[in-house]
């Protein structure tokens, strides 16, 4: 069995959700981690069980002759680091969002094509038990056609969320606020259920409003004024006739459970957090929720993030071993989710609908 030499770039809060599932793969040798803060890298290296630490990711890739890197960095660094890693001959799995612009994302796709390597992007909630049940019921025709959809995300991001970070809260570094950082997974799931179509062909137009209502007088740790949206609502219209509404905000009093509702020909769907209930008009119903035994020890981090990071990482390495595209590839996300998220911002900033 080929052993992939793997490195972690970025040793912040999300890094255990990449390193520990990667380390658990029989085909992986987790050899090094990298962070501009060497002490942070050393601390994570102990948790991850890797012997080498670096402050320069290019040096790490070259010296360790890495096959794969996981990118766990601030949003604005996803693209430049992924592009360079691909150029150096590494396969790449990056955290969401793919990038903070279409130009950045296109550079990643071009680098992947030129290198012949594989690029994947984390959208782990598609692997949740509830998500898989809904997908199965839709694909089987049990629910018929979707007629309409809606979702909402009402979470809490206190001032400390921004004041403790030197990059969050700015368009240049975070790329947005409540949409790209908090609601992106829920909006993606809703659109995945509806169906993006090949290369996003089913997307018709979006019409969005964004605002900064509760964080506009806050500065982040670098002194930059928080100017990204903390609330957004709008319409995502599809060419198959489905109109989907969304609402998100990050100044609620607590992190409430996200919700997705689908109104279908033969029934309806309600997704609440990771649990899904499918109710058919003939009286039948189906449900799925996280199995208490279906857990993964990430060695730290919020337990409510569940085991789905590990499931997507399993798929990524299985695809590398088989020489196939991962289920959630960079090319797929570029043509669908990323294009849609960027359109939401284009509409929100301009105050006008944006056509695909």
Labelled PLM ranges:
Residues 1, 68-70, 106, 239, ...:
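C-terminal helix-rich "cap/oligomerization" subdomain common to oxidoreductases
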Residues 1-48:
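N-terminal Rossmann-like dinucleotide-binding module
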Residues 18, 48-111, 308:
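Beta-loop-alpha module in the N-terminal Rossmann-like domain of NAD(P)-dependent dehydrogenases
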Residues 36, 301-313:
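Active-site loop of classical SDR/Rossmann-like NAD(P)-dependent oxidoreductases
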Residues 54, 94, 119-121, 246, ...:
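Hydrophobic residues in well-ordered beta-strands that form the structural core
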Residues 107-125, 144-151:
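Rossmann-fold dehydrogenase core element
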Residues 125-225, 351:
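Predominantly a Rossmann-like dinucleotide-binding segment in NAD(P)-dependent oxidoreductases
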Residues 188-277, 310-325, 342:
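Contiguous beta-strand/loop segments that form the cofactor/metal-binding neighborhood of enzyme cores
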